[in-house]
């Protein structure tokens, strides 16, 4: 399966976001990992 891009909805407990992105627990979408 393809990874999730920016602002795609995601599950924080099963993070499928693309590399250098993380699932935001508050908004439930993928965002850039700043650190």
Curated annotation (Swiss-Prot):
Keywords: Disulfide bond, Ion channel impairing toxin, Knottin, Neurotoxin, Potassium channel impairing toxin, Secreted, Toxin, Voltage-gated potassium channel impairing toxin. The keyword rRNA processing does not apply. It comes from Theraphosa blondi (Goliath birdeating spider). This is Kappa-theraphotoxin-Tb1a. The keyword ATP-binding does not apply. One of its GO terms (molecular function) is ion channel inhibitor activity. Expressed by the venom gland. The lineage of its organism: Eukaryota, Metazoa, Ecdysozoa, Arthropoda, Chelicerata. The presence of a 'disulfide through disulfide knot' structurally defines this protein as a knottin.
């Amino acid at each position: 399966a393809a990874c999730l891009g920016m602002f795609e909805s995601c599950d924080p407990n099963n993070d499928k976001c693309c590399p250098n992105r993380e699932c935001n627990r508050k908004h439930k979408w993928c965002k850039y990992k700043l650190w």
